[in-house]
Every structure is written in C-alpha cells, then in structure tokens.
Design a protein with these regions (language model features):
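Hydrophobic alpha-helical scaffolding
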Residues: 17, 21, 62, 116, ...
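C-terminal beta-sandwich/jelly-roll accessory domains of carbohydrate-active enzymes
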Residues: 328-339, 348-350, 355-556
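Aromatic- and carboxylate-enriched substrate-binding clefts and catalytic-loop regions
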Residues: 40-264
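Short, low-complexity, polar/charged sequence segments that are solvent-exposed and flexible
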Residues: 23-26, 63-65, 102-106, 204-207, ...
Length: 556
C-alpha cells in the first residue's frame, strides 16, 4: 500500500512554507504525472494544519482554502485516489478548544482528556463527518494519554489516567472501524516508543501497547532524523536512524509489516533539512526493504524527473510481490549499536538482501537463510550499491565498505534485469585504516591530537559527545528557520605548520532534532605527509562533555 503525504513539500513547524490549496493540488497533479512512468499511489494524505483554528476540525483555513476541501476531494476521487486527513488527536496544536471540548481540557492547557468531558464523543463525530464526505484514511498524531482535568488528577494515579484514556480511544476507534470497515487508521507520535535518539535505553521507556494493532493498520517509528551513528554522509546516518527504529519497534513485538518507517521524505524545507533528493535511491530502497505494508512517501513529487520516476517505479514493482508475501526478516546487529545488519525478503523464486555496514571499517556480513525451506545461498549478485567500494559476494557472505549500503539478489533476483545501479550521491572509500592519533584534553569540552600525517589517503575525523554520565548527547542550537547550524557547537579544526587546513563536512546543518557527532575529511592535497598535523574537536555546550574522536586514512 502506497501513501503520498504532502508534509515536507510544506512545513509550518520548522519552516515558513504554508499548506495551501494551490500547493496541495500541484502535488496531486504530480501524482498523476508520475503514473505514466509506472508509479502507483493508493492514498493522498493531507497532513497537518489544513484546519481553521476555531473550527473544531470541521472547517478548513479560509485564507488558504477559500472553497474548503471539495475540489481536492473531488479530484482525488476522479483520479482513483483515496483521500486522507491528519488529526492532532487530543493535542491543541494550531487549533483552539471548541466549546464542546472545554470540559475536557487538561491542566496543561493544551491537551484534552479522552475519558472525561465532551472532547472524545465530538472527535468521533468529526471522524464520521469526514468519512461520510469521502475521507478513507485518518492519521492520528500528538496523542497525550496523561491528559486529565484538575479534578481527576486529585483522585487518580497517573497510570490509571493513562490506562483510562487509552481504553477510551481504543474502544471508540474499534466502533468506528466496525461501522466503516474500509477505513485506514494510522498512528504516529504518542502511541509508544522513544524516537528521539538511537542511543537511548531499550526496552522503551514509553512501551508500545500491542493492543493498538487491533485498531490501527500501522504504527510509525519516528520522523526522519540523523542517528547517533556518525557517518561522513549525513543522509546515510538518517538511513541508519530509520533502520534502528524499525528494529526496536520489531523487538517490542510489532510485526515488520505493521511498522511504517516514514523514512522517504524529499523536499526543500527545514523538516527534512533541505535535502531535496540527495541520496534518495538508498532511502527508497530501504523504505521497501524493511517490509512495511504501508509505505509513506513525503514531499515534493516534482523533484522526481522522468529518470528518477522510472527508477522509483522499478523498485516499487520489484518489491510489490515480496511485500505481499510478508516474508521479510531483519538480521544482523542493532543499527544504533554500530553493527552490520540488513533486511531480507523472500518468495518462492529467490530473495533480496539489503545490507548496511554502519561501521568505520570494511566488514564481511553473513546473510542468513530467511526460511527453513529456502535453498542454501549461492550465485548471488550485487544489484545495488553506493559508489566507490565494490561489494564482494562469496556464498552467503557479502563484504561492504565503511558506511555502505548494498542489495544482493539470489535465485531469480540475481538476474541482470533486476540491476538497480549505483547511488552516486554516496561515495564509499575503497580502503580505510585507523591512524594512530592520541587525543588529550585541552580544556573543557575540547580534545586535541598531534600525529604524523600518513603517506597516503585523505584524513577522516569522527567525533562524538557524551554527557558526564556517559550518555551520548545531542546538541541543539535551534531548529530551522531561525536556528544556528550544529557546526557552531560541534567543531572540528585542523592545522599543519601553523596553517589551518580546510575540512570537508556534511553535518554542519540547521537540524531540528539535534546532533551528537561531527565528521569531516581533509583532502590529500591539502596537507603534507610525514609531518606533524594537529586535529582539535570541541563542543560549545556549557555543561561538561566527554568527547571521543578517531582519525582514519581513507582512499576513494
């Protein structure tokens, strides 16, 4: 199932690009354009902030939607698309409490109880109102089950309040589904899981209640953001974040097919770090390789030209039967623990293994059998890879370069017709070696190493910060559009013979989710071999931080 969501083509949280009817209709026309290249969508999800602040989710913003949603709903129907709508569940985000909700407003002033007052009954009538007008998918975001009025907080424990709110919503949604059996319900923020970091403890502090699967078709596993795994390519660290969260949700008991990684997001807005289509091929491949039955595509579809659209359609067609089989398995280590891992999908004719090496070394990864009836692996072929390092397959093992993504086909999928090419946006070194560089403290939150520059290769510097308790810690100098770039806090400097050396970086961005690391490279032609070279890594955080750094020699 393929869902187009227009978030990141606009952004009203970390940017100033509003949702308008013109923008929404433009993306609908792009969906139609992409059909001629073979791309298929089932749903069009209208994301956040379509609603008038005082309309109780029944009216649309007049300035941006002078005629309401009628034209959009009609155009979806005319073109065989099922429309969907975003709702902030019980949080007052860019919306005011309607009169009938006010006796549900909790002590926070911006969340509403789901088990007392008039909010939930009215909210369910809102959902039915939009279903009757043709809406077939409903997205639930920003759920806060701790919401309670002052009177309730005096008589009930927090865990009792949470349980009562969750039960009230789940039972109401079950009745809504029973009345409208063709509806799609998808859950986002607030329904369990800790999505802020890949370095957090597990099991989740906020556990996932598997009973939500009785009413929701999918649960999402976090908005795209960089992981706490440093990578020279910023977008690769984001791939690792989504992979990690899918694995953690699976470990929490969710089947892979019920997890929506929501990882594919293109756009030129703050929410997606002004990515446009950088490293988009690997992002799409991983979206389908993880095995989710709900595949959500976000952003500016006009960024997909004919060549990109045809490649997109090939991936979509390739994985359609594999996803339908529901025989996708995760294997290997945990992404956030910087261990090689992958996802394998199997049918009766063969298998595709999509494999990631998040480490700063060349690694050989064993590809496990995905089923007891699967034939031993042999005759495999690399059908997709990043540029640079050429992966090697030997029997049931594949060798990958540092930070590399690749896909290997076996059986029918080893045929040349399944070749997906090379991701040129991600360059992987053909060799990497650790340089002996001993970092020492040079004052608060600053470390430095002086070493002899190696005779070959560029120099790669990787560093990360931890708090005084040893936990990996993100710096957040402000999100877009007015925040500062993370490079103003997490800094890498290098000099040789009294001259500062240029350092190529990809991490120095305005990042709404924060960042815990820095990565940079000094090109071979910018330093002299055999002479002393000094590298300094620092954090401008006011609290004491523990910094860790490594230097590598890399050849492309």
């Amino acid at each position: 199932m393929w869902v187009y969501n227009n978030w990141s083509s606009y952004d009203e949280l970390s940017d100033n690009i509003p949702l308008t009817e013109e923008l929404a209709m433009k993306e609908l026309h792009e969906m139609i354009r992409l059909r001629k290249f073979g791309i298929h969508f089932d749903y069009y999800m209208m994301d956040a902030f379509w609603f008038a602040p005082d309309g109780g989710y029944r009216t649309w913003r007049k300035l941006n939607w002078p005629d309401g949603p009628d034209n959009w709903i009609a155009a979806c129907k005319e073109n065989g698309l099922l429309p969907g709508m975003w709702f902030g569940t019980n949080a007052l985000v860019h919306i005011n409490a309607a009169p009938q909700w006010k006796d549900s407003v909790g002590t926070s002033g911006w969340t509403m109880s789901l088990s007392e007052g008039g909010f939930l009954p009215d909210f369910m009538s809102v959902l039915q109102y939009w279903y009757d007008r043709g809406i077939r998918m409903f997205k639930f975001d920003f759920a806060y089950f701790d919401a309670a009025t002052a009177e309730t907080q005096k008589t009930m424990k927090p865990e009792e309040i949470r349980k009562r709110n969750e039960t009230a919503l789940r039972e109401s949604l079950a009745k809504f589904r029973a009345k409208n059996p063709d509806v799609m319900l998808v859950a986002f923020n607030g329904f369990g899981g800790d999505v802020e970091s890949t370095a957090g403890p597990f099991p989740f502090h906020n556990p996932v209640d598997l009973r939500w699967l009785t009413v929701f078709d999918s649960l999402y596993s976090g908005d795209p953001r960089p992981s706490d795994v440093p990578e020279m390519n910023f977008w690769r660290s984001m791939d690792i974040y989504s992979d990690h969260m899918v694995r953690r949700y699976e470990e929490s008991g969710l089947p892979l097919e019920r997890i929506d990684s929501t990882s594919f997001m293109i756009g030129n807005t703050g929410t997606i770090y002004y990515r446009k289509t950088n490293a988009w091929m690997g992002m799409l491949l991983l979206e389908v390789a993880r095995g989710g039955w709900v595949n959500t595509i976000h952003g500016n579809l006009e960024f997909l030209d004919e060549a990109k659209a045809r490649w997109f359609a090939r991936v979509q067609k390739l994985y359609a039967p594999l996803e339908a089989e529901g025989r996708t398995k995760a294997f290997g280590g945990i992404p956030g623990d910087v261990e090689p891992y992958g996802f394998g999908s199997l049918d009766s004719t063969g298998a595709i293994y999509t494999v990631m090496n998040p480490t700063q070394s060349v690694e050989e990864i064993e590809l496990p059998l995905l089923s007891r009836v699967q034939e031993p692996l042999g005759g495999g072929r690399v059908i997709f890879r990043d540029a640079g390092f050429v992966p090697e397959i030997s029997g049931n093992k594949i060798k990958l370069g540092p930070g590399q993504l690749a896909a290997a086909g076996f059986g029918r999928y080893a045929g040349p017709e399944f070749d997906l090419g090379v991701e040129e946006d991600v360059q992987i070194p053909r060799s990497i070696a650790l340089v002996e560089a001993r970092f020492v403290s040079k004052g608060q939150n600053t470390i430095e190493a002086t070493f002899t520059a190696p005779p070959k290769g560029d120099l790669r510097i990787i560093f990360q910060q931890r708090n005084s308790d040893g936990w990996i810690t993100r710096s957040w100098p402000g999100g877009p559009p007015k925040g500062k770039s993370v490079g103003t806090v997490l800094k890498i400097r290098a000099e040789q013979n009294g001259k500062e050396l240029p350092i190529a970086t990809d991490y120095d961005r305005v990042i709404w989710s924060g960042l815990s690391w820095g990565a940079g490279e000094i090109r071979r032609g910018d330093f002299a071999e055999g002479q002393a070279l000094t590298v300094q890594c620092s954090s401008a955080e006011k609290s004491p931080m523990k910094l860790e750094a490594r230097v590598y020699s890399v050849e492309y």
